[in-house]
Amino acid sequence: MPIASSISSGPAPEPGFGSQIKALADGFAAEPAWANYLQAREAVLRMMDDWARLGPEEGPSTYWRQEMGGFDYLFDASPLVIGRLREHCHHLTGVKSFDYRPHHAHLKADFVRKYGVLLAAGGEDLFVPEPLALGGFGFDVGPGLANIDTLKFFEVLIGLRKAGALQDFQAPDGPRRTVVEIGGGWGGFAHQFKTLCPNSAYVCVDLPPTLLFSIVYLKTLFPEARTLVYGEPGFEAKLGEMEPYDFVFLPPWRLPRMEQARIDLAINMVSFQEMTTAQVEGYASVLRALGCPALYSLNRDRSKHNAELSTVSEALGRHYQLTQIEVLDEPYTQIAERKRPRELAVTGYRHLFGRA
């Protein structure tokens, strides 16, 4: 038998690795996430131009220029990168998929323990697992995947319920309410909140490079959602009627001019602690001036190495009457059980709820 004939009559060869990668990338390029990324990138680039034109006090700081240098490659990403967007969110929270791979399965029991502690704290119906979409990751704690971010968001939802701030948002027949998250990151908490409170308008306020993550993530997870992004055609007129929108994406300098919008609740997680006293007080002052009646904070009162902040509670307390909400006697970062609970000092995490 001729050699050529014997080769052709055998089973088809497996495609090479390069062909497999190309097929995977082509598949991601046909997914909605890629189209969402292309639109989000153009919007964020316009925001970046506006940001650069602001004065030195409002424009990008040296710190944020350095931080953005860690993920500026996302402005020239491929479909394969966007299809695994969650792999790259560690630039914002430090949570990496590597720590949840099978060779770390021995850590799963600690996450199951922490999930149980949160359930006992009053979160029976508030857990929203990490979605698999866009490369989601975590350990299976029973009802789904969870990582440190997932459990942090779960803890804040429990705190909001304990503060009496969540119930009105969950009412299906009540008026549509608006929540503003200062520093929404990659959009993980927005996903959980909107899943539990679909009759709400969610405003993500963050620095332009970070909005690249949240716009893509939330538009992909909620394909039917009505979204409004700073700078799009007719943006100013549309913002005056914010209630029809599910998600609104704003840079910080646009927040003070939301006079026409009704804001029912503002939330911040672990970024007030990294700001200066003037910046934290500035946000509280703006929210108060806009008529926001309630503010929720999960932050260290002051990060150990932040010499430019007095305390978060002092800065917020000038504009809101604060109450500490007791959720757990351990910080959200503690997953494994400790025999003795850690003492809560000025550098410990505190759940604070403020009323105007």
Language-model-derived ranges and their functions:
Residues 217-259:
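S-adenosyl-L-methionine
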Residues 157, 190-191, 211:
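Conserved SAM-dependent methyltransferase scaffold
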Residues 289-302:
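Conserved beta-strand signature within the Rossmann-like core of class I S-adenosyl-L-methionine
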Residues 186-197:
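Conserved SAM-binding loop of SAM-dependent methyltransferases across substrates and taxa
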Residues 49-172:
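Conserved Class I S-adenosyl-L-methionine-dependent methyltransferase catalytic core
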Residues 274-287:
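A short, conserved alpha-helix within the catalytic core of class I
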Residues 3-79, 252, 314-356:
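Rossmann-like AdoMet/SAM-dependent catalytic core
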Residues 173-185:
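Conserved class I S-adenosyl-L-methionine
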